[in-house]
Amino acid sequence: MGARSSQTVDPVLSRRYSSESETVLVVRRRPPMVNGGGFVVSNSKQVVVFRVDGCGVLGTKGKLLLRNGDGNDLLLIRKMGGIVQALNMVHNKWEGFGYDNEGTERLVFTLKDPKDSCLVQNSSIKILVHGKPPKISSTRNNYVEIKGSFAERACNIMDSDGKAIAKVRIEKEMEEMVGNKKDLYHVIVKPNVDQSFIVGLIAILDYIHGESTIC
């Protein structure tokens, strides 16, 4: 019997959204004038497994909501504001909140992105994963990092050991078919990685780059 693939990142939201095999997700942007923007994520069977709503649906800037295919809320993402954030000249701060069994919000990750748009294109973005439950005695594997260009649909999400746990790509045939690489692209998720967490990070990248979730 073959060895099972090692899990590089503990489930951030739920083990339910991971797979023992590599998974290719298809991201399709929704027209802002029809559906309020955002995007939907389908699996290889063309079944919608995630939906992301942004400003056009929620009516609030700096707020994103990830739902599963059944429409249940999975992850609420907020761009932090206030005086302290305004005084930070280097980074914007984002926080992702999952929900416990009683529907109470719990902080699951924190992301900081450069305020300088040039740095967004050329530097990595680090995410602190708070875990479920939060890890106290060890910080190992509590970080993931995004490297590459999301705008060009050529970026990797890496674990703390530098191994890719997900990739954003667009096939040449797909680009020729849709004409705009931003409208339809692939997210390739490695085995035993929480796909809902990965899609949550994609939602923030989409917003940072002024795409379907912004208004």
UniProtKB/Swiss-Prot annotation:
Record-linked SUPFAM superfamilies: Tubby C-terminal domain-like
Keywords: Lipoprotein, Myristate
Pfam family, one: LOR
UniProt keyword annotation of Lipoprotein present: yes
Domain of life: Eukaryota
Keyword Ribosomal protein in record: no
Transmembrane segments: none
Protein name, entry field: Protein LURP-one-related 16
Provenance organism: Arabidopsis thaliana (Mouse-ear cress)
